[in-house]
Amino acid sequence: EGSGGSGSSGNFTTASNIHMSSVTNTSIAGTGGTGTGTGTGTGTGTGTGTGTGTGTGTGTGNGSASSNYRGGGVAIQPVTLTESLLNK
């Protein structure tokens, strides 16, 4: 904004008043977002086992056997001894 002056001898004088408004830049720092995460996991396992065993046993037994044999005998015939047989 300025105003000019007047001059009578051909001299021109100019006076100027310049007003500038100051500009202030304000920056706002941004904030980061938040995040959440979930995770699942599974696990498997195997196992083996072996075992051995022995066993013994005893046993008793009773047995009997009998035999009855009746065989026919030879019949003994009576012999008559005579004098003629004895003298031979």
From Swiss-Prot:
Keywords for the protein's UniProt record, in alphabetical order: Biological rhythms, Cytoplasm, Nucleus, Phosphoprotein, Repeat
Compartments, record wording: Nucleus; Cytoplasm, Perinuclear region
Annotated source species: Drosophila teissieri (Fruit fly)
GO BP terms, alphabetized: rhythmic process
Gene name of the encoded protein: per
PTM characteristics: Phosphorylated with a circadian rhythmicity, probably by the double-time protein (dbt). Phosphorylation could be implicated in the stability of per monomer and in the formation of heterodimer per-tim.
Domain topic, free-text comment: The run of Gly-Thr is implicated in the maintenance of circadian period at different temperatures. Deletion of the repeat leads to a shortening of the courtship song cycle period, and thus could be important for determining features of species-specific mating behavior.
Biased composition (Gly residues): 30-62
Protein name stated in the entry: Period circadian protein
Biased composition (Polar residues): 79-88
Keyword Transmembrane among UniProt keywords: no
Region (Disordered): 23-88
Keyword Nucleus: yes
Sequence repeat residue numbers: 30-31, 33-34, 35-36, 37-38, 39-40, 41-42, 43-44, 45-46, 47-48, 49-50, 51-52, 53-54, 55-56, 57-58, 59-60, 61-62
Main location per the UniProt record: nucleus
Record's function text: Essential for biological clock functions. Determines the period length of circadian and ultradian rhythms; an increase in PER dosage leads to shortened circadian rhythms and a decrease leads to lengthened circadian rhythms. Essential for the circadian rhythmicity of locomotor activity, eclosion behavior, and for the rhythmic component of the male courtship song that originates in the thoracic nervous system. The biological cycle depends on the rhythmic formation and nuclear localization of the TIM-PER complex. Light induces the degradation of TIM, which promotes elimination of PER.
